[in-house]
Structure formats: C-alpha cells, structure tokens
Swiss-Prot record:
The keyword Cytoplasm applies. Keywords: Cytoplasm, Hydrolase, Metal-binding, Nucleotide-binding. Its EC number is 3.1.3.5. GO terms for molecular function: 3'-nucleotidase activity; 5'-nucleotidase activity; exopolyphosphatase activity; metal ion binding; nucleotide binding. This is 5'-nucleotidase SurE. It is found in: Cytoplasm. It holds the Pfam family SurE. A divalent metal cation binds at residues 16-17, 48, 101.
Length: 277
C-alpha cells in the first residue's frame, strides 16, 4: 500500500454472511471512515462455513445494487475474484476487508470461515487483506454488540495499514462479546485450538417422520492457554492474529526427509543420447 494516507486507498468490502448482513453495513461505515473509495462485492446469500471454496460447477451471477455495490451468487472467494478480476480490473483494490462476521472466527474456526477465506483470496491475489469478526455469547446472535467493532476497528485498521505486514500473511481480528467500555485491551495472539469433542451432530425429525441433522458446537466456559486468540476473547480483549498462507510444517518436513533418506533425494534425469547425423 504505497499510497500516502488512507483516504486515497481503494478498499474492497466483502463478507460471508451475505449482502444484507448487519455486519457488512457496519464494515461499510468503518471503511468510509478510512477512505472515499469504497466498493462492496458480497455474496447474494449467506455463505457461512463455505471456507475457501470456489464455484466451479455453476456460473456466477452478479447483481449491481448501486454504483459501487454488487451482490454475487457465489462464495466469498468468488466475490473477491469477481471484484479484482472483473469489476475493478482497471484499478484494483489496495485493501480487502472481510466481515464483520456475526460470531467469532478463532482457533479452528479459521479453516471453516468464509470471512477469513475472502481475506485469503485477497492475499493470494497480492492485496493486503484483513478479516474482522464480532463474538457473541451464550445469549445468542440476536444480541451481537456491533458497537464494539465499530468503535475500535477504525483506529486499529489505520495503525495496521501504516505498519504494513508481509506478503502471504493476512490479519484476523476478533472483537469480544462486551460493550466498548468493557474491552480490557488489544492483544496480538497466536491461533488457538478448540476441543473437538464439543462438535455435535443433532438429529431431528421432520413432518414426514424423516430424520435430518444440524452440526454445531457446545458452548462451554473454558480456560484456554495464554497468548491464544481463544484466551484473548475469553478475557474480553480484542484479538489480532497474523495468519500465514504457507501451511507447510518445516520441522516435520525435515524429519520426514531424514526418515526417507535416499528415497527423498531427487534423481538426475538421464541425458538423452545425441542423434547421429
């Protein structure tokens, strides 16, 4: 982002909750505090849990809502691709912001999240990208404290933009389930890990006596490790986690290379015999 000042930045806003989601409206307001050049390209319908998927078996349909706002019948990754490669192809975005998600995206959530996937897509396309999510508690998603993200996000984004971060890295921001005055701080964290025994499959019966199922997570109080995104949200802090696109575990790669020994050594291709004239 070489442009001086945020007001000259071209910002792309997207999400996974859909074009009519309240969190998208909040993020639009935040983006307009940072720049005059804000574009919105978001899914026509909710795409929560779509992860980093692309629509390869179906065509993308694009609906223009206003001069700078589009709905795409596709995934969050589709939306970013459509924006960068088509809608804004003549002058690409300087920044992608995705969210604000209804619910936290921390720990293992990052592998499922369409919100984070949109930021991943932006990162893959060489554009600095940030995912933002607002946690909600046991009272349910009807009581999401959007004011917390709206209050803190503008200054956080300005400082992140000024500082910059490496290519192949995206920024994942999560706001705790408290009102702005009850936030206890801001912490740069590492990705935590959930207890996968909390994943549940709930069976129900429809009107024709056929079973159907819902996937979900049990919500319990826990004591996550210090320094993790889980702990920060648990203690009412804003969590900022840099996520790296390269998922290779280098220590294991070296150990496997040592274990395989000569099998892991590349073989030289034999030279082809020169033709006789």
């Amino acid at each position: 982002m070489a442009k001086s000042g945020t007001k000259s930045l071209r910002i792309l806003v997207t999400n996974d909750d859909g074009i009519h989601a309240p969190g998208l409206k909040v993020l639009e307001k935040i983006a307009h505090k940072l720049s005059r050049d804000v574009w919105v390209v978001a899914p026509e319908d909710e795409q929560s849990g779509s992860a980093h998927s692309l629509s390869l078996a179906n065509p993308l349909r694009v609906r223009k809502l206003t001069a700078r706002k589009y709905a795409v019948r596709g995934t969050p990754s589709d939306c970013v691709l459509m924006a960068v490669r088509h809608i804004l192809k003549d002058e690409q975005p300087d920044l992608v912001v995705s969210g604000i998600n209804r619910g936290q995206n921390i720990a293992d959530d990052v592998t499922y999240s369409g919100t984070i996937a949109a930021a991943m897509e932006g990162t893959q396309l060489g554009i600095p990208s940030i995912a933002l999510s607002q946690a909600f508690g046991f009272s349910g998603s009807a009581n999401v404290k959007w004011s917390t993200a709206e209050h803190f996000a503008p200054d956080i984004l300005k400082k992140l933009i000024a500082a910059g971060w490496p290519e192949e890295v995206l920024i994942n921001i999560n706001f705790p389930d408290v009102v702005p005055g009850s936030v206890t701080g801001i912490e740069v964290t590492r990705q935590g890990k959930r207890d996968q025994s909390l994943v549940r499959v709930e069976e129900r019966i429809d009107a024709r006596n056929n079973p159907y199922y819902w996937l979900g997570f049990e919500r319990i109080l826990s004591n996550p490790p210090q320094g993790t995104d889980l702990r920060a949200i648990y203690e009412s802090r804003i969590s900022i986690t840099p996520l790296h696109m390269d998922l290779t575990h280098q220590k294991t790669a070296k150990a496997l290379n040592d274990a395989l020994g000569t099998l892991a050594q590349p073989k030289r291709r034999p030279r082809s015999a020169s033709r006789k004239k």
